[in-house]
Amino acid sequence: MKKTLVASSLAIGLGVVAGNAGHDAHASETTNVDKAELAQKALTNDQSLNESPVQEGAYNINFDYNGNSYHFESDGSTWSWSYESTNNATQPVQPSQSQVATQQQPVQVSAPQNEQTAQPQTKSTSTSQTSSSKASSGSSVNVNSHLQQIAQRESGGDIHAINPSSGAAGKYQFLQSTWDSVAPSQYKGVSPAKAPESVQDRAAVKLYNTGGPGHWVTA
């Protein structure tokens, strides 16, 4: 994707540790961290982890819990979190990160991308912006902010993206059968990744308006 951080279905981020003037919290000082609660939030991709750090101040926390290795850090203004499996899995899993910047401007939030297979997870980036409906870059189609977030989580906004494991393609990672049900006649049977961005946007808006966001696992 086109932002700085990586996200996958097995990657999360947490931030825990208070900080105050003249004193930075270190991992050794975070004995009050509720590992079970943080791990559960990570595994369920609790949105609160992307919206704010769990405590104020700088921190750097690492721990292993129930077969996963967790990492959380913050410099006091930005925070990141990630985890990766420490078990011997049948398929390799690549860790990824998610980072949120605290600014006066619209907050940029990254979130893990969900995969519904046991295939190797591919690295991707994800950034969502809180904004009103607007036209996508290179497209005159008005796409609502939720659908923009879905596109970022699915492909990072790459209209030519193709998932090698599932075959999903395009900006919104359409499966071919789903694409054929909403695409214009001249693009039916054609890979979504080969269609112009405006065509992909219209198809996604049509699918969203008729069936809701449930067609995307990252919604």
From Swiss-Prot:
It comes from the Bacteria. It is an enzyme of class 3 (hydrolase). Its EC number is 3.2.-.-. InterPro entries: Lysozyme-like_dom_sf, RPF. It is found in: Secreted. Transmembrane segments: none annotated. Residues 86-143 are annotated as: Disordered. One of its GO terms (molecular function) is hydrolase activity, acting on glycosyl bonds. Residues 1-27 form the signal peptide. Keywords: Glycosidase, Hydrolase, Secreted, Signal. One of its GO terms (cellular component) is extracellular region. Its main location: secreted. Residues 89-140 have a biased composition (Low complexity). Is able to cleave peptidoglycan and affects clumping and separation of bacterial cells. Belongs to the transglycosylase family. SceD subfamily. This is Probable transglycosylase SceD.
